[in-house]
Amino acid sequence: NFQHRPRLDIATFGEVPSRYLLNSEFIPIELKEVYRGVIAQALEGVRRCYDRVGSVDLIRLHGDCHMGNLLWTDEGPHFVDFDDSRMGPAIQDLWMMLSGAPEEMKQQLNEILLGYEDFHDFNPQELHLVEALRTLRLIHYSAWIASRWDDPAFKAAFTWFNTQQYWQDRILELREQIAAMDEPPLMVGGNY
């Protein structure tokens, strides 16, 4: 375990950020109860996904592993931006590397896992966590912006954040995630 790094779990990326947002003044009053209900449903969906997996081994993660944090040089690829590094399930560092239609994502994931398993075993049950982790990331991201809203740089960079439209879009996005978490997980290869 990291000595000074938190875990990525339902509490740290879902429950705590949700409470922060619901106790703040960012969500318009006319949307707050709708948001509260959608967050409750979303977190219940996340719990169901974790229940499907059972025991989850936690490993050291990059935490924000996507193509924007992969720098290519003459020596090859290098990961950057480790400030979100934490303990969590291995799939967290894999799912954000995927893009496109489901068939494309299956192919990408299969290729990633072929290389990944040269270094570490992968528990295919963690595929049930992809949409749950996406949901937690969406919740955490809104709280991350809200917690830094007093910084003028954030107000300049995220002008759309403190608007009615932003929160309407988040409600719709979370409703879509609630449905996605009830779908079968992404499956790849013969063993996954």
Residue ranges of predicted features:
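Active-site acidic catalytic loop and adjacent metal/ATP-binding pocket
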Residues: 44-94, 190-192
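A cross-family kinase active-site recognition segment
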Residues: 1-34, 58, 157-158
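N-terminal alpha-helical segment
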Residues: 13-20, 42, 90-93, 109
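Short alpha-helical "patches" and their helix-cap loops
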Residues: 4-7, 110-116, 153-165
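ATP/Mg2+ or Mg2+-diphosphate-binding catalytic cores
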Residues: 15, 25-26, 143-192
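Active-site activation/catalytic loop segments of kinase-like enzymes and analogous catalytic loops
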Residues: 90-121, 137-153
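All-alpha amphipathic helical-bundle segments outside canonical DNA-binding/catalytic cores
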Residues: 124-134
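Charged, amphipathic alpha-helical oligomerization/scaffolding segments
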Residues: 37-41
